[in-house]
Amino acid sequence: MGKLLLGLALIISSAPILAGDIEGIVRITRSLTKKRVVVDTYAPRGGAPANGAAPEDIDEWGRTVVFIDSSISPAQTKSPLPLQQIAQRNRRFEREVVVVPAGSTVSFPNEDPIFHNVFSLSKSKSFDLGYYPIGQTRKIQFDKPGPVQVFCHLHPNMNAAIMVVPNGYFTQPASRGEFKIDGVPAGRYTLRLWHKSAGYLQEEIEVSAEGKTQVKFLLPLATSKP
């Protein structure tokens, strides 16, 4: 009897996982707001254009993440990502938004011939890497899902964000807003969109085995008027 149960367990564990794809598009909708004056403070938390960029130069898709915010068994998770980094270069953070699954480590190399001091006061992860010069790096592990806004004590115009997601099923939209998450185990999920300044949107979806689930997000972003 024990051997029979063991055999059944092995068959079940080795069975292929039925999976489908999530495909969709993010449409940006604009609304006029009064032009804001942003003072030299960390209060905006990413609401202002990053690193002094003009609004028309901002890559809004690069500031957007789409991910499954639901529990997925370890047997169904994706392979770990290579080490991600946010470099300090030309008094800017590159990249502006990095996405990692919970438990991942991110490095912060200083490639400027000046000191930087990277820090965050976010609820998901609070840290202060201290002052360090060109050629050195610091690493931090991010265990709790959620957005982590990153700044520099010495250069208030520098800001970036790390979006820590609960699993490996995430993506960022392409240049026209299209996105795809493939190989998702069949089931019901909460699909969330996060934007660096606009926050969260979400949809409840059902992924069928070997099928495609279509999703559309309308992302409201403000356009300042003179």
Locations of regions flagged by a protein language model:
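Hydrophobic h-region of N-terminal signal peptides that target proteins for export
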Residues: A9-L18
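Extracytoplasmic copper-binding redox domains, predominantly the cupredoxin/blue-copper superfamily
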Residues: L18-P226
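Positively charged n-region of N-terminal signal peptides that target proteins for export
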Residues: M1-G7
